[in-house]
Amino acid sequence: MAKRVADAQIQRETYDSNESDDDVTPSTKVASSAVMNRRKIAMPKRRMAFKPFGSAKSDETKQASSFSFLNRADGTGEAQVDNSPTTESNSRLKALNLQFKAKVDDLVLGKPLADLRPLFTRYELYIKNILEAPVKSIENPTQTKGNDAKPAKVEDVQKSSDSSSEDEVKVEGPKFTIDAKPPISDSVFSFGPKKENRKKDESDSENDIEIKGPEFKFSGTVSSDVFKLNPSTDKNEKKTETNAKPFSFSSATSTTEQTKSKNPLSLTEATKTNVDNNSKAEASFTFGTKHAADSQNNKPSFVFGQAAAKPSLEKSSFTFGSTTIEKKNDENSTSNSKPEKSSDSNDSNPSFSFSIPSKNTPDASKPSFSFGVPNSSKNETSKPVFSFGAATPSAKEASQEDDNNNVEKPSSKPAFNLISNAGTEKEKESKKDSKPAFSFGISNGSESKDSDKPSLPSAVDGENDKKEATKPAFSFGINTNTTKTADTKAPTFTFGSSALADNKEDVKKPFSFGTSQPNNTPSFSFGKTTANLPANSSTSPAPSIPSTGFKFSLPFEQKGSQTTTNDSKEESTTEATGNESQDATKVDATPEESKPINLQNGEEDEVALFSQKAKLMTFNAETKSYDSRGVGEMKLLKKKDDPSKVRLLCRSDGMGNVLLNATVVDSFKYEPLAPGNDNLIKAPTVAADGKLVTYIVKFKQKEEGRSFTKAIEDAKKEMK
């Protein structure tokens, strides 16, 4: 753009001063309007110089020419001709700009901080009016030279090259046009209405060659539906299903036309009728009320509703409710030594019974574990192994109702009895009870002669059985029976005080844990034993010397119980030695019992300044780790009379072994192992061989470690 402007200026100046190289061509040729519309050419503004009577060297000519400074320097001063047209819009625009400049200068000088936006809005309005006005061109008059030759007129069809011409220029882009249509007569893809099939002429022209692409056809109808959403309306057909539905959610009213196989699971009330009972298969699981007519059919394994049918022959292993099954043949159970069994006498009670059974069948076996109060009947019953409730037996068994026939029906007692036996006298006389191996309650059977023998069977109708009964192996209760028995065995282990003072023959007990008063001294005595010898003790054999074992209370009867080889001397001195042993017991027992045990740990004359549980560790140079010495109570002890003597003492938990016993040295530093580890305290000590050993005392909390170091520092201050 700048080059074109420069060339135009040079041509114009050379033309005015006759410096053109080609004199034949008087002026430049203006391009056509079509060419000028396609390109933008900036032209300088021109002034109209009109001096019909003046010379070309006048000052007006110089002022009128915008390029008067380009005159030749030789001073010829020939007049220049300005042939550029001056339009009315240019004059208006110039006047507008001069007024706008003056207004802006006045406003800025008066008010430097003024807002110029209103001026620009008005300027924009005025300039739009000027640019929209029609352009009128005015031709400048031509000036003649010295000769009479008239130069050719230059057609000025150019528009103003001002910025106003920018709106009139239309820039059009390239256009793409297709001269001929494609040779394809029938296209593959059609976007308009369907074309009619034209008959093709038989020719060899290449333009008529039809190019066909792939075709996709979806014609045809689906013969069979994969998914049928509409239900079938054919209600006349009757289809018989051979397989039963696994689940039934509604009440089924089966008929002869339907299948005979029933649903395995029935979730509602089954009201099926008109079905053959022999081919009827009951449901495995029944969740509703079932009205079964045939009692011989199989019952459901699990019944969650109330069954209105008759009870089955098999009873459940677990019973959670009271059973109210009646006997069928009641009349056969009386006036017989061995009653006949009823129709359901073979029924077995559940293994676990959690309620009071009211079944009166003759041969009902009791549950192994009984958690309730059993109502025993007349029939023969077996007691449970473990009895946790008070036994309230009824009257005699059915076999003992007849006075003439005395038949014994043994019933086993529970092996473990955790409550007191409150049985009636009739039951004890009528039954042979095996006493429990372990007795945890107080036996109150004082009326019978052999009631203190837990395992001795009782006699029926006053008959005394001579068989020997054994005591329980372990007796944890107090036996209050004071009657005399012929054959009595003392329990192996006795944990309570025994009051069997009138027994004729006493057996030495190996272990005695309570206060007992037998004549013999036990091997292991854990309590005070006092021998009560009867008046006719001369007839009883002399007590033997007990074996030496673990004696926590010395049996003092051994001083007067030594025997001699002479039998006559033993009989004469038995009573004297017995009296002397009792006196020696009273005299020697007083100082032995009153003497306290003096336990000293060496801390009696010291004051504990600090005491806290801690873990003691030492550093192992080989493994580069800390080895634990033990866990115990870390104490800081100070002498009461000498504050300068302070030591560290740590005993292990349990055995009380000394883990650390070292004197606190004033020059040693007892500080944390690291600045952040206040619970790990270094405790330097001097070993027996003179070496320095540093222990690490590990506390659970950091506050405990701070208290430990503070207690040591306070003790050091008192040492000085």
From Swiss-Prot:
Write out the biased-composition intervals (Basic and acidic residues): 147-159, 193-202, 424-435
Q: What is this protein called?
A: Nucleoporin NUP2
Region Interaction with SRP1 NLS binding site 1: what ranges? 35-50
**Miscellaneous comment text of the record:** Present with 2960 molecules/cell in log phase SD medium.
FXF repeats, residue ranges: 67-69, 216-218, 247-249, 352-354, 550-552
According to the UniProt record, list the residues that bear Phosphoserine: S17, S20, S137, S165, S203, S205, S348, S351, S581
Any idea which UniProt keywords this protein has?
A: Membrane, mRNA transport, Nuclear pore complex, Nucleus, Phosphoprotein, Protein transport, Repeat, Translocation, Transport
Listed under GO biological process in this entry are: mRNA export from nucleus in response to heat stress; NLS-bearing protein import into nucleus; nucleocytoplasmic transport; poly(A)+ mRNA export from nucleus; post-transcriptional tethering of RNA polymerase II gene DNA at nuclear periphery; protein export from nucleus; protein localization to nuclear inner membrane; silent mating-type cassette heterochromatin formation
User: Which PANTHER family does UniProt cross-reference here?
Assistant: NUCLEAR PORE COMPLEX PROTEIN SIMILAR TO S. CEREVISIAE NUP2 (EUROFUNG)
Subunit structure, interactors included = Component of the nuclear pore complex (NPC). NPC constitutes the exclusive means of nucleocytoplasmic transport. NPCs allow the passive diffusion of ions and small molecules and the active, nuclear transport receptor-mediated bidirectional transport of macromolecules such as proteins, RNAs, ribonucleoparticles (RNPs), and ribosomal subunits across the nuclear envelope. Due to its 8-fold rotational symmetry, all subunits are present with 8 copies or multiples thereof. Binds to the nuclear basket of the NPC through NUP60 in a (GSP1, GSP2) GTPase-GTP-dependent manner.
In terms of SUPFAM superfamilies, this protein maps to: PH domain-like (SSF50729)
InterPro entries xref list: NPC_Nucleoporin, NUP2/50/61, PH-like_dom_sf, Ran_bind_dom
Compositionally biased region (Polar residues): 81-92, 243-278, 315-324, 373-384, 513-533, 574-584
Domain RanBD1 as annotated: residue spans: 583-720
Where do the segments described as Disordered lie? 1-33, 52-92, 136-278, 315-604
* FXFG repeat start and end residues: 189-192, 285-288, 302-305, 318-321, 369-372, 386-389, 438-441, 474-477, 493-496, 511-514, 524-527
What is the native source organism of this protein?
Answer: Saccharomyces cerevisiae (strain ATCC 204508 / S288c)
What does the comment on domains in this protein's record state? Contains FG repeats. FG repeats are interaction sites for karyopherins (importins, exportins) and form probably an affinity gradient, guiding the transport proteins unidirectionally with their cargo through the NPC. FG repeat regions are highly flexible and lack ordered secondary structure. The overall conservation of FG repeats regarding exact sequence, spacing, and repeat unit length is limited.
Q: How does it sit in the membrane?
A: Peripheral membrane protein
Q: Compositionally biased, Low complexity: which spans?
A: 345-360, 479-495, 534-548
Q: Which GO terms describe its cellular component?
A: chromosome, telomeric region; cytoplasm; mitochondrion; NLS-dependent protein nuclear import complex; nuclear envelope; nuclear membrane; nuclear pore; nuclear pore cytoplasmic filaments
- Phosphothreonine: residues bearing it: T361, T590
Gene3D superfamilies named in the record = Pleckstrin-homology domain (PH domain)/Phosphotyrosine-binding domain (PTB)
Q: What does this protein do?
A: Functions as a component of the nuclear pore complex (NPC). NPC components, collectively referred to as nucleoporins (NUPs), can play the role of both NPC structural components and of docking or interaction partners for transiently associated nuclear transport factors. Active directional transport is assured by both, a Phe-Gly (FG) repeat affinity gradient for these transport factors across the NPC and a transport cofactor concentration gradient across the nuclear envelope (GSP1 and GSP2 GTPases associated predominantly with GTP in the nucleus, with GDP in the cytoplasm).
Any one Gene Ontology MF annotation carried by this entry is:
importin-alpha family protein binding
Q: Where in the cell is it found?
A: Nucleus, Nuclear pore complex; Nucleus membrane
Residue ranges crossing the lipid bilayer per the database entry: none
